[in-house]
């Protein structure tokens, strides 16, 4: 099984949340660390954390993130690498591009926004086991995350001008032949959750 690198996108402003989403408290730990820890069940796992706005708050809250910028850091069995997007104003796609430039060109990746909970091992494995240019989980007839991208596809994202209207992952996926996309049905509505407000966060913490 080709083990993909996890890319956690945490470079946004978190305006509606009011504070960096990855630094929210989740049962005594920080949310970004919880997300990383959920990937430990995948053997030989590597996680890239894409930071942008508020990156200094992340580095202050998690001191070893500073070390993980230059060298990978083992956290709960996951090799973590931190990448800072110095131009986060261009959106999450620019953060994704910044991270992808650090990833081995032959590696498969799975992309997850910080405000979408990572799936459990069984659901995640069902995504990882599928082989195509793009693999997308679905639940209740809604597409979601994490999205798996093979190296052939994601390498085509690197040259895209961040000023372009096409500088969006969903736009690039829509341009693919339908045979290049596999949809995997997941019995977990986490795939389409977007926990971007305090109300949604409080509800998630109470129900999970």
Predicted regions located by residue number:
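Conserved nucleotide-sugar donor-binding
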Residues: 144-157, 198
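A conserved catalytic-core signature of glycosyltransferases
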Residues: 142-144, 148-149, 168, 190
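Nucleotide and nucleotide-moiety/phosphate-recognizing core
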Residues: 2-143, 177-188
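Short aromatic/basic micro-patch
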Residues: 118, 148, 194-195
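Short, well-ordered alpha-helical scaffold segment located
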Residues: 118, 123, 153-156, 200
């Amino acid at each position: 099984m080709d083990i993909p690198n996890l890319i956690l996108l945490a470079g946004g402003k978190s305006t509606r949340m009011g504070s960096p989403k990855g630094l929210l408290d989740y049962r005594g730990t920080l949310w970004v660390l919880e997300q990383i820890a959920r990937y430990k069940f995948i053997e030989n796992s590597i996680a890239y954390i894409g930071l942008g706005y508020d990156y200094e708050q992340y580095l202050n809250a998690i001191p070893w993130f500073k070390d993980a910028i230059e060298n990978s850091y083992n956290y709960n069995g996951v090799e973590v690498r931190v990448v800072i997007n110095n131009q986060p104003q261009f959106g999450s796609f620019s953060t994704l591009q910044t991270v992808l430039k650090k990833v081995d060109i032959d590696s498969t990746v799975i992309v997850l926004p910080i405000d979408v909970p990572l799936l459990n091992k069984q659901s995640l494995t069902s995504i990882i086991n599928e082989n195509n240019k793009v693999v997308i989980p679905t639940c209740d007839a809604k597409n979601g995350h994490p999205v798996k991208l093979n190296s052939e596809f994601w390498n085509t994202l690197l040259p895209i001008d961040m000023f372009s209207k096409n500088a969006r992952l969903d736009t690039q996926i829509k341009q693919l032949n339908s045979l290049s996309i596999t949809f995997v049905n997941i019995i977990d509505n986490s795939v389409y959750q977007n926990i971007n407000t305090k109300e949604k966060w409080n509800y998630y913490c109470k129900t999970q």
